[in-house]
Design a protein with these regions (language model features):
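Loop/turn elements at helix/coil->beta-strand transitions in domains of secreted/extracellular proteins
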Residues: 3-6, 47, 104-107
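Short catalytic helix/loop segments, enriched in acidic residues and glycine
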Residues: 21-39, 72
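Acyl-thioester C-C bond-transforming condensing/cleaving domain
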Residues: 41-43, 59-64, 74-234
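Active-site phosphate/pyrophosphate- and oxyanion-stabilizing loops and adjacent acidic/basic residues
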Residues: 66, 70
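A short N-terminal beta->alpha junction/helix N-cap motif
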Residues: 15-27, 52-56
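Short glycine-rich or small-residue beta-strand-to-loop segments that form or flank ligand, phosphate
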Residues: 48-55, 83
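Generic N-terminal amphipathic, Lys/Arg-enriched alpha-helix
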Residues: 4-20
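N-terminal alpha-helical transmembrane segments of multi-pass membrane transport
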Residues: 9, 42-46
Length: 234
């Protein structure tokens, strides 16, 4: 079997919420239940779990993936978490495909769930950031992307309205997504973008994402399980 013999056979997501009314474990359970319902697979058939990204909630511990498997009642032979920032979801797919290809599991559950806003337990008072990054203004991703964008501007030139087009297009997509955060389902224009507050020059407020709560997941498997393929658009 090769990597191309694997497929996403089911997808589920909660609504993105400014602040959730359920904790991270409840959201994770909702995703699992929806995927089982969509794909018709029995929970006992899931033998792989791959968690995406980092969480700042009660699920935040070095054994997040193992803890989640225990809470959800999953008995898996392959269990890990992928920390690659904003591309963690894609990393999960690659990791699950490789695990199935090498015979480490047959049916994988890919999951991210977070209630960072509901259960904000962030404490940076004793981290490296206070000494090594915050004095230079790198207080989160916007600062780092500001430096990268400035370097690009110096070397190649940068049309700020081009960046605005990205923000406007993404917002327009959110307007079409029923699961998008309601607070952000409001159209914006290029002028709105250009007039938004500068955060880390040239990164503006409307370039940034805000913290939000929610969960999403995939059921991933090889061709031998395609008899239980669910409709992704359900």
């Amino acid at each position: 079997m090769g990597l191309r013999d694997n497929a996403i056979v089911g997808y589920a997501e909660t609504k993105v919420m400014e602040k959730s009314d359920r904790n991270v474990w409840v959201l994770a359970g909702e995703i699992l239940e929806e995927l089982l319902d969509k794909t018709g697979v029995d929970k006992n058939e899931i033998d792989g779990l791959v968690m995406a990204g980092l969480t700042g909630t009660g699920a935040a511990n070095p054994f997040w993936a193992q803890t989640t498997a225990d809470v959800l009642g999953l008995e898996v032979g392959f269990c890990e978490q992928v920390h690659t920032g904003g591309c963690s979801a894609a990393g999960c797919v690659a990791r699950a495909a490789a695990a199935i290809d090498y015979g480490m599991c047959e049916v994988a559950f890919l999951l991210f769930a977070d209630t960072h806003v509901l259960e904000d337990r962030t404490d940076h008072s004793h981290t490296y950031r206070r000494e090594w990054t915050e004095p230079y203004g790198l207080m989160g991703p916007p600062g780092a992307f500001g430096l990268l964008s400035r370097r690009y501007e110096v070397q190649y030139g940068l049309d700020y309205r081009m960046l605005g087009k990205l923000a406007v297009t993404q917002r327009n997509h959110a307007l079409l997504n029923d699961n998008a955060c309601e607070k952000l389902r409001v159209p914006i224009t290029i002028d709105d973008y250009m007039n938004s507050r500068m955060i880390a020059d040239p990164i503006r407020l409307l370039d940034c994402v805000m913290r939000a709560d929610g969960a999403a997941g995939d059921r991933f498997g090889g061709t031998c399980h395609r008899s239980t393929v669910g409709r992704i658009d359900e």
